[in-house]
Amino acid sequence: EKKMIATTRMFGSPVSELRDIKEAVATYTSRAAEKLRRQYGAASMISVFVVPKEERKPGQSFRHGPSVSSAITLPHATCVTSELIKPALQMAEKAYHKSISEHKTQLFKKAGVMLSGIVPDTTLQGNLFIPASGNNARMLMDAMDNINFSMRNDILKFASTGMERNWKMRQELRSPRYTSRWDELREVK
């Protein structure tokens, strides 16, 4: 059982728009929440980071700029994607503006989400002042996970994850996934 779940990816090309970073963070949060539910856990803390692209000087090898992160402790542990996306998007915006003010850059190469403070979802402690999402939200998430697993990934997704995804990783050189994708299986004629 994992104590922390992270989903991070490089962008296909450097990103400058806050909207693209928010879409990426929402997508990564959704993916991390799926992993969290697979291990029957709930997270009480979420961290978001962005990595600005640094200009390369002649003769210098490529490197990332220093990452800018933001973290928050949630009012109660949860594995419900919608309850994780909202604070993640707020932190993404905060990290974006902080990076621009500190590093004077508007190009970003990478973003990520980390869920920590993971506890079993059977032993969740409630909060007297915050209404619990209840079992219905968990059942909805399980139904979404089952549909996405049986049909294909991302057939059902949250609108905040975006539709076009221009920031998505390039995968032209990826090896075919013969053992896990029917549509990539070779045909003999």
Predicted regions and their residues:
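Acidic, metal-coordinating catalytic segment for phosphate/diphosphate chemistry
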Residues: 65-189
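DNA-contacting surface of Y-family translesion DNA polymerases
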Residues: 1-105
